[in-house]
Amino acid sequence: MSREITGKMPARKIRKIRKAAGLTQEEFARFLWVTYSTLNRWEAGRAVPFGLPLRILCLLERKLSSRPFQAVLQDPRASDPTFLLYRLLHSTFGRRQPKRL
């Protein structure tokens, strides 16, 4: 069962999530698969995220408070957006066991 993510994410919350992840705007934009100018508009409140970037932001917001994910953020590779996205998705979806037929 999937939960639909809708609504707006305030600019201050996006900035707070980025800073908690320890990423620059450029790194965070690559992490979310958007341009620097798009992220800049979100953080300035001139536009709002939707679709996949919004889903990733919501996942990251939830994971930031967990100890295991805090350890991921301390890893020197965490400034690499690909590494961070992989670890985020793996920590969210990677532990499920496949259903037996």
Where is each model-derived feature located?
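Short, charged recognition helix plus adjacent turn
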Residues: 3, 66-101
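Coiled-coil-like amphipathic alpha-helices with heptad-repeat character
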Residues: 10-13, 20, 36, 82, ...
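Residue-level recognition of specific faces of alpha-helices
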Residues: 13, 38-41, 56
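A short, Lys/Arg-rich alpha-helix, primarily the initiator
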Residues: 1-20, 58
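Short alpha-helical DNA-recognition segment
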Residues: 22-41
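Short, basic-rich loop-to-helix N-cap that marks the start of a DNA-contacting helix
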Residues: 46-59
